[in-house]
């Protein structure tokens, strides 16, 4: 019996695993292959179904904002239309697209786009191609990025918007004209509004941007005397204030534009994302924002007062160490025998980050404040601030949490590791006019990360392997610790 379930003739995306193999209910068929029945894994039982409800006009309660689910719904509907046009299927596109491929493919697009965005963000923070290449490569070959981009959960969507917003924000900070500064600031507001409409954690990204703008102003004008009326006037009207704002904008104009970008636009986008709730009658137009506000309160109460536990829950301080990853899927019945080893086949999918990337990023994150202060390094300061604002908000939360809540912080763990590696790569020994020694360290580090990715690939994709190869401890299988099972 074969030990891989890939069927090139199956659903579109089969070979890259979008629809298959991680579906519940593997069973050997008489033809000695594996049948891929439809099925949800982990929180797909909520988000994929809620997305389908959005298409069908069915009311539901979910404590997360609606935009990410609407994007999943767009994927389901589009795939349903594809089946009608290219397969000759008959029926409602919403129902025809309600398949694993339908609710997963949109996330895969957004997840894939995060990779070049990380390259662009890194290059904008520090115009060093080694830094940018390392950031994109580490993103591409991390297990959490890989998994969350391939399943019907909502987390990849806010991550995409957050990375894009940070990129636009840094483009804005480096603007040279008032026009470019205004355009990029407003675009940043639009994207951060989309991020908040996908998940509330994006509010932390917005807070970090506002903090950076405030620090820029304070640092630039800390020497101004503001204790007198004349000093206050100088803060608001002096020509000396112009350069403090990106693009040379005057401070009063810039503050007004920032209020529009960071308050008005996100509020409008967030409110607009709830229009489907009004359209299907779950909210009533006659009540104005009353139903929406009540829903927000219920969502907050859910997060604040949830007391349920979960066997794969983990405390926030354990996440960087990969103490307790989440098993999204596991199957050990009816998969057959591995022809090479004679072991029973098992299949699983664990939300485990790439250990090489995660563990080596920890000292890099710790080093960032030192580099920021010693070298007055904006990239180091920005990455450190981004990590803290995406990670620490989880600390006071008492409800059950999971490793994937580290997703936002992972952006900056990757950037921290890439930044330190790129710093080490600078000034290497030149041979034939080319610097080799230190860049070799960076390339070797990335190569090991790729090897780790290849090794753990089966437990990120649900490909059946021998049980010892899966469950064996360190040096034997992929589940190195009992807490990983």
Show which residues each predicted segment covers.
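Transmembrane helical bundles and short interhelical boundary loops of multi-pass, membrane-embedded
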Residues: 5, 10-11, 22, 26, ...
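Extracytoplasmic catalytic/substrate-binding loops of multi-pass membrane glycan-assembly enzymes
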Residues: 10, 15-25, 36-48, 59-74, ...
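Transmembrane-helix signature of polytopic, membrane-embedded enzymes
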Residues: 84-94, 113, 118-141, 176-183, ...
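Transmembrane-helix motifs of polytopic, lipid-linked glycan transferases
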Residues: 93, 101, 105-126, 164-168, ...
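Short acidic/glycine- and proline-prone juxtamembrane loop motifs at membrane-interface regions
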Residues: 107, 124, 144-157, 198-201
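Short helix- or helix-capping micro-motifs
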Residues: 135-140, 147, 167, 192, ...
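Membrane-interface transmembrane helices that cradle and orient dolichyl/undecaprenyl
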Residues: 165-184, 214-222
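Hydrophobic, aromatic-rich transmembrane alpha-helices
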Residues: 332, 350-376
């Amino acid at each position: 019996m074969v030990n891989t379930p890939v069927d090139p003739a199956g659903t579109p995306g089969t070979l890259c695993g979008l629809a298959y193999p991680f579906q519940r209910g593997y069973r050997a068929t008489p033809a000695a292959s594996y049948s891929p029945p439809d099925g949800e894994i982990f929180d797909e039982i909520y988000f994929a179904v809620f997305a389908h409800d959005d298409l069908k006009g069915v009311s539901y309660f979910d404590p997360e904002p609606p935009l990410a689910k609407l994007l999943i719904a767009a994927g389901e509907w589009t795939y349903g239309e594809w089946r009608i046009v290219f397969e000759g299927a008959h029926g409602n596109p919403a129902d025809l697209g309600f398949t694993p491929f339908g609710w997963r493919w949109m996330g895969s697009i957004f997840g894939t786009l995060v990779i070049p965005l990380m390259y662009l963000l890194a290059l904008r923070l520090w115009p060093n191609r080694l830094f940018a290449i390392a950031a994109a490569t580490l993103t591409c070959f991390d297990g959490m990025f890989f998994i969350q981009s391939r399943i019907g959960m909502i987390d990849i969507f806010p991550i995409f918007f957050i990375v894009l917003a940070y990129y636009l924000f840094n483009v804005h900070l480096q603007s040279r004209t008032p026009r470019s500064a205004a355009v990029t600031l407003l675009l940043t507001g639009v994207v951060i509004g989309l991020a908040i409409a996908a998940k509330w954690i994006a509010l932390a990204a917005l807070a970090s941007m506002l903090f950076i703008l405030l620090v820029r102003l304070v640092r630039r004008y800390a020497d101004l005397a503001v204790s007198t009326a004349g000093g206050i006037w100088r803060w608001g009207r002096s020509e000396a204030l112009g350069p403090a704002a990106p693009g040379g904008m005057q401070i009063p104009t810039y503050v007004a534009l920032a209020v529009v970008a960071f308050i008005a636009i996100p509020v409008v986008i967030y409110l607009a994302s709830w229009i489907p709730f009004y359209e299907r009658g779950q909210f009533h137009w006659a009540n104005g924002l009353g139903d929406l506000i009540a829903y927000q309160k219920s969502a907050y109460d859910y997060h604040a007062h949830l007391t349920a536990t979960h066997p794969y829950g983990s405390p926030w301080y354990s996440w960087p160490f990969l103490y307790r990853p989440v098993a999204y899927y596991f199957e050990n019945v009816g998969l057959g025998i591995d022809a090479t080893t004679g072991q029973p086949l098992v299949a699983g999918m664990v939300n485990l980050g790439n250990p090489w990337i995660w563990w080596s990023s920890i000292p890099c994150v710790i080093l960032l404040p030192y580099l920021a202060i010693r070298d007055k390094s904006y990239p180091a300061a920005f990455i450190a601030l981004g990590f803290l604002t995406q990670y620490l908000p989880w600390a006071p939360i008492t409800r059950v949490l999971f490793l994937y809540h580290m997703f936002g912080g992972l952006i900056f763990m990757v950037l921290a590791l890439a930044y330190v590696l790129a710093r080490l790569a600078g000034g290497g020994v030149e041979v034939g006019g080319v610097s080799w020694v230190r860049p070799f360290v960076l390339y070797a580090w990335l190569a090991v990360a790729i090897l780790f990715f290849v090794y753990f690939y089966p437990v990120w994709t649900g490909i059946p392997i021998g049980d010892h190869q899966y469950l064996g401890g360190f040096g034997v299988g992929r589940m190195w610790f009992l807490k990983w099972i």
